[in-house]
């Protein structure tokens, strides 16, 4: 009994600990210790004693009883010392295994490292730390052994699940396997093959997560310190007080630039930071925060002391990731100095970032950021050159708009003309969308109609694609040209015709999708001469322009040669040897598609195509046949089996015989041998069809010609060539077997007699249709052999089958695992138009079917390559039979790590990754130096480089050419089928940086459809056929260059890659990273580490784009704290592009749909604002950047500035993908502005060569969006201003006072300081939207005071009249802040763009002007502000219209401009120090006034929506609920949403919040979803009388210190009316709430500069209430946090009588910035950290609820309204991710009242955060139901066709909405 007592007490102690009853825990532990007494312990009691002591230590730490805890710690170690035999650690291990120490562990680590300010710092914690490290050491042993035994121990039955999953909901069932019982991916499939497997995967994920979490909690204290610090920063009420880049009393100097470039791959660098502390501070800890690049950085040395002497401190040899001070420095002086050396080293290319944290014993801790680019020094200038061809998308030329002069003579035969006429695209919906198309599968019954319709749909998609190619080129006119090489020869123009040659650029190469279409499916062009003057003279007015048809005569790699007809030459007076500038439109060659239609109609018997497999055919076998001496001895067993099947007597009916074999297994050899045997049968006749001419010629050159020459004239083949093929281009040996007309040297079509005279006819699939036209009776060919059958669509393959009957032996040979033919229509691709007949039959036949023969001996590749492809793609059936010599240094499967960032150029659909470019070039050089003799001569084609993306191909090719290695073949994978290389390099390009899991409901099907957009877009990461095609090109070596973590965690091929990398690891051919590191990073990713990624960080701008500008602060400069004139970090330079940077045109519009380009976030923070310790995306950690918790499907539209009028109206708008025109941005896709997420890489660390950059600066100068959605052109966000704690909610909203502050009477474009005006002008203007052309409204007269402005408006209902007096509003910043040159105010702001003001204002100081002028004029035009436009919210509109009133003209302009410069108060190349910040007066108080009614004009005006919006009900945005509650009922008709449409709550955290914290209308100030920047100057024109349509345009101006005035700005640029492309309100967007768009104005509008990049903006006010928001990501949790803990009333002014004077408002003095005395910051409500998991089209996220409703609901729920907290400005920048979070307003909740409702309660009732960020991460997510509008596509054919004809194009790739 005695023995049981201590055990029982220990159990009770741990129970109390878990229940957080710490006194009880101490009591129970003491009881256990007393029960054991002082007697000599046995091993079991010793363990019990240790356990009791540990529990007591934990409890005492929680009770803050540190001394007693330390005392207990002594006893623990005393026992260990007494024994000294290692039994102590063994005991700890056993305790860890049974889970007894979990609680102790977490208490210890939290107490020691999680809460540095709770008093513990004054104690000596050495023993406790040692105790924790002992427990850690024991745990790591336990975990290690567990991990190794995991699979065995758990006894899992199914395949291991795919990696890189961040939620068990991401596992899916394999639709294909369930439907067909067959999956091409086999064991490598990333979807489960049964419900049981799926369940097991989810269980495995959960158990692994638990294990990882335990591991993480037990991590060594340093990691816990780092995670605790970041979590604290994320959850902090005042994040800037947790971490900051400046700390009071500490000055930081650094020895070299914090951002450097190293130009060798193997390189190292170190930085020395000197911290000068006065008064003395103790440096307690230094840590490196950023997990991803840990292996590359370390703390090398630390010294401490004073100015006279520094003493080195102990640091681990070789450096460490975290350093703790052993003892405090006591030098008795008033200051101390620390020096810290941070070392960096790398052996791979990439971009590496790290954040160094210095903990000086109090918060905020100091942090500094460093970055290294490891890049090749080779400049990439040629890649930045503008593409020469101007791409245009204009109206297609046809007889309705142009007179088309056809080419004479027309060479089409009568039959071809009749085909073109017969198969016209049907125009009516019921003809195109028949039931057969909507059927799920192809059947014998729907065969013809379904394929006809899909072909028409594909033709429309090709047509759309080719319309993108209107190019302006210079034609060189010649009378003859010559081609060299085997197909060489000269061509001469005759009969008055001429040849014209033009050069191909990358735009038109086969490497791009549309280029490929032009090169393969276009054979004529229409040309329009550009010299209009000459043309205009002889053309009558109103006559249609004449365009001329020219034929494409020849296509080479570099040039296209046209044949120009005589009529054109005569009319235009063309002569040879001159140049002619023309506009070209390519004409799609419809003939091949018409021939496919014809082939479909010619197939008489479908049964050949749908063989009955219920009866297994018998292939007679006999030893004589198997070992026939006449069979070639080189045939292997499987090849002989194939020949037996092919030569089976025709009396035995066989279904089509499939000869399946990968590249190199001898398919062609087998078929050729079979032909010889067939010809031995009497009456046999063979038709050989191939997909390509080269393969057809191979049969003749290699097999039939030698056979005929050997004395077999009966085997003489007839080779049929396309009649227009130039004879010279055909091999002379093959010409012997062709029909050539003696006179014209052209090929002739065979006659029926010609065919009957030959027993072997060789054709390509396309020329086989000539045979069908000869009236040959079906069955004339006894055998039809189709080689390369997997590369042709089924509609092509059946052309020769028109000649087949039931008894015809049909043989299809090919590789079903190679690339399928490309289909441009996604709709048709989904319906398997691209699937070959071979592929379909392969799946149709059972696995052991005798007519499905797999050739399995590969003769061309090394055994290791064969084994890999065999296991992964061919069910393990392949064998290596050839002897390919390996390389002595490199295993045949080798992996080189490059951790760059994949980038998408502005107008391109492709990606590139410069780190991989440099790595490949270096490895190719190395391979050439180490070329083994056994590989033979190094020649052209020995080394191949393949990549899925054209942009990467161009870059690698250019880099290799520079190094004189042009013999290396660099191709897209699509172009290497049929080729082979001794060594093959694969550049995978993609990283997790841009690849997000597509987990939205609408995209879920992407995982199930093969060759889906994801396959195209993710390249090697998702398309297994692409991967197989590439790998099987190699003979001796496959070397992959890429990011291993991305490959193993993204896309459907991740399990293939995991296998590849593990093979490399086992064979020591994994370079640049270890397998362990990969596993660790994958686990970190799956654990959703909170600090791997800063989701709010801005896009990184490489140094290459900013080379001309010196850094603002060089080495040795000081960072003062608090910052007095500082905006960006010391090492940040302004991101301007290099001189001569030209905007690439939209040339590469073609190809895959424009995909998610890196989501931008925040830029430089305000001084005093906390910068993020978390680095922006690092190429090395790509895998870790985006835990899917941040989202699945972030699609960032990009602007495509297109310099011609009319482009805008070219495409219909699909808001999901519209990527040009501000008007077409779907702003719901924007990421939120950060809460001034720490100064990140937007403008700081440069990558000199475009590593991880968006190459085109127009898109990329990503500045931090401000809280209210505004951005300064000089690269800084407004919410980076000094948002001091003293400002209350009104000021935040008041910020919008300058949204439309002043009407600029001058036509001058106002320019912000920061960009010279000449950089702001774009060729392609956009029409101002009507709202902004509005005249001032009489009811809003401009206010003439410069430093005053009206505080409140009272508005009577219908008429807009002023009812209240204007009150002066004084500035409340000290006078010292108003130093610096004055600057004019902003003008109106347009939804399209914020134009730039002229920097040369008259009031500007001369030195400032000098700086501005100093910029080279040729530099690339800079992006202006893109405004919230597209799908805007009510609140933003109201804010824009009501937030201010007009102020007087020029002096007001000058003052506001001064303020905008001044708000920064910083040194930059454009801003002198000390400019005044922009005061934010309290201005919106009037909005809560009762009786305020918003006139409909205001509601309608300027709304960024068009008609489409009326079709979807959308919740509105309660920015001014008090105001909106007064709307009449008819105005509220859209207030209620159908419950079915209400997106349900998705995160547990949200539900938790709703249960625990009932809300009331008065709870929080209401949010605004996006305050658009409508900034552009109004024209200087008379007012328009018609105010009924126009909203008021009077806007307030913020106050300024007196005595600053300036003259008007000079007028420089105006555009003509003809250049405005937008006719009316908005293309394709409607206004919600049943509002109507304004009528179109004809008056010329003011100038608007084009924005050239997407600014992502969100208002600060959008944070005022966040309980309504819900992340929209599929099953992603929401992270929310409260911002502050005390609550002054939100809108004090709104509760005062209207005529009470408003107290003056001043900025607080500098000593209050960082939290000095003064008003306590008010709480802002909960913060959302945005998830990227957006739907494509998010409806508006908020709902207006009437006041009456709110009151009823409150009564119904008996809710007490909590206090309405105002936001804490310093952290209230919006984090709402527009379009990502549906509203979360359950039926029982109402939006908050901004204070007008009278619900005031005393301040100071904080709501503690209900859940930490980490807990939110861990909360299991719920699946997201589909939005109603997304849940299904319209299946009504008429609607489908209407959409089709409207042309819902994807803007860049010619897919239709319904063709997707």
From Swiss-Prot:
Compositionally biased spans, kind Pro residues: 1760-1769, 1783-1794
Basic and acidic residues bias: start-end ranges: 1286-1298
Motif residue range(s): DEAA box: 787-790
Sequence positions that bind ATP: 661-668
Feature: compositional bias, Low complexity: 1107-1116, 1641-1660, 1847-1860
Enzyme Commission (EC) number: 3.6.4.-
Role this protein plays: May act as a helicase.
Protein name, as recorded: Probable helicase with zinc finger domain
